[in-house]
Amino acid sequence: MGDLTIPTMDDIDIQSKKVLLRIDINSPVDENGKIIDDSRIKAHIGTIKELINKGNSVVLISHQGRPGDKDFTSLEEHAKLISKYLDREVIFVDDVIGPYAREMIKKLENNGILLLDNIRLISEELIEAPPQQHVKSFLVKKLAPLFDIYINDAFATAHRSQPSIVGFPLALPSAAGRVMEREVSALAKIFNAEDTPKIFTLGGGKVHDTIRIIENLVRKRIADRILTGGLVAELFSVAKGMNLNPKNMEILEKLGILSLIPRARKLLLSGAPIEIPVDYKVEINGNVIEEPASKVTGIIKDIGSTTAEIYSSFIKDAKVVVLRGPMGVIEDERFKSGSKSVLKASLEGQGYVIIGGGHMISALDEDMKIDSSKVHISTGGGALLLFLSGERLPALEALSMSVVNSGD
């Protein structure tokens, strides 16, 4: 990403234009289709407002779930929420590329906002292919001629190579929206050689994903220290030869984590700057106690208080801190303290903090203040994972190829 030049909304003329804005408002819904977390919807309000304030007519496109899944729903409820947060009418169109949708787009006046229905109603949108193929898709061929500009504000889908993400930049002058721009500039700090030391705090249960991240960080010598928690810490503890007792080993085996031991051991033997807990908070017959990592008898549920202190001391001196995944079973109040400690140290330190994913946010206490000038909460789950794993992000590649005609 570091060598890609991504055009932003500052690089193109966006005054009184017809704008196609790709957002990601894919939200968790309950069994009745009611949205239970609208944070992704709120995230895009600033970009939409800016476009409307410049006299543009804006057509929004997004997906919701996948065909066959329970969360594959219409975007009608999403339109109501966007309207609520903008405090203005948002026209919902129960169509995507049909005659009705195209007619409504043509009729949309300046300062008007229209949301097309779930873009994954179009089967092409589920196909992963290069931009050169997707620019020829029905979706792009039907919609692109109706617009002056395409803006991609959907960082959470940046790892997808689908028509709505990579097709339009080859057909229209295109740029990153403000959410996308913030994500890209925040993540660029990870590769800035001057911002050291860089501390990566990696926990949670997605161990197969996390070991890919660690291998990339070590290969590119990006991380000065990697602090492990959650099941990631247990993997590296076992790889180092620690006996975590049969019960914990059984859990790791069931989750397929023991198969990763050779890769973890190889990283440790290479001298990678990986820190593992010196103590754990464990549960024994419903009781919570702390035990040294070398003498674990209970079921591991969190990092211990000594480990939390050690990790916090590393974090406070860092220039960049990346937090991905909790240190323990964060859903249980008894095992939140490890995550709270590293989060508190990050927020109180002098460095720039990137928080990936919502789990760590749930560890925030009311007295923990987030300074938006030095803290970035990423919206991109899969996209962030691929980026940290060293993969290219198709959305950014496509934007870098865009036919930008600034001022035309």
UniProtKB/Swiss-Prot annotation:
> PANTHER family given for it?
PHOSPHOGLYCERATE KINASE, PHOSPHOGLYCERATE KINASE 1, CHLOROPLASTIC-RELATED
Similarity field: Belongs to the phosphoglycerate kinase family.
Q: Which UniProt keywords are given for this protein, alphabetically ordered?
A: ATP-binding, Cytoplasm, Glycolysis, Kinase, Nucleotide-binding, Transferase
Annotated binding of substrate, by residue: 24-26, 40, 63-66, 120, 160
Q: Give the EC number(s) listed in the UniProt record.
A: 2.7.2.3
Which pathway or pathways does this protein act in? Carbohydrate degradation; glycolysis; pyruvate from D-glyceraldehyde 3-phosphate: step 2/5
UniProt-annotated binding residues for ATP: 331, 357-360
Write out the GO MF terms. Answer: ADP binding; ATP binding; phosphoglycerate kinase activity
Q: Which GO terms describe its cellular component?
A: cytosol
The entry's protein name is Phosphoglycerate kinase
| Primary localization class, coarse | cytoplasm
Q: Please provide the Gene Ontology terms (biological process) for this protein.
A: gluconeogenesis; glycolytic process
Does this UniProt record's set of keywords contain ATP-binding?
A: yes
Describe the reaction catalysed, as an equation.
(2R)-3-phosphoglycerate + ATP = (2R)-3-phospho-glyceroyl phosphate + ADP
Q: Give the matching InterPro entries.
A: Phosphoglycerate_kinase (IPR001576), Phosphoglycerate_kinase_CS (IPR015911), Phosphoglycerate_kinase_N (IPR015824), Phosphoglycerate_kinase_sf (IPR036043)
Can the keyword Secreted be found in this entry's annotation? no
Q: Where in the cell is it found?
A: Cytoplasm
